[in-house]
Amino acid sequence: GCCHLLACRFGCSPCCW
């Protein structure tokens, strides 16, 4: 994972998907 859980929700996708 290159992003934090919160970051994923703010538009850090598709990092955490």
From Swiss-Prot:
Keyword tRNA processing attributed: no
Any one GO cellular component localisation term in the record: extracellular region
Signal peptide: none
Cysteine pairs bridged by disulfides in the record: 2-16, 3-12, 8-15
Subcellular location: Secreted
GO MF terms held by the record: toxin activity
Keywords of this entry: Disulfide bond, Neurotoxin, Secreted, Toxin
Expression tissues: Expressed by the venom duct.
Function text: May act as a neurotoxin. Has no activity on mollusks (tested on the freshwater snail C.retropictus).
Family stated for the protein in its record: Belongs to the conotoxin M superfamily.
Domain-level remarks: The cysteine framework is III (CC-C-C-CC).
Protein name: Conotoxin Pn3a
Organism of origin: Conus pennaceus (Feathered cone)
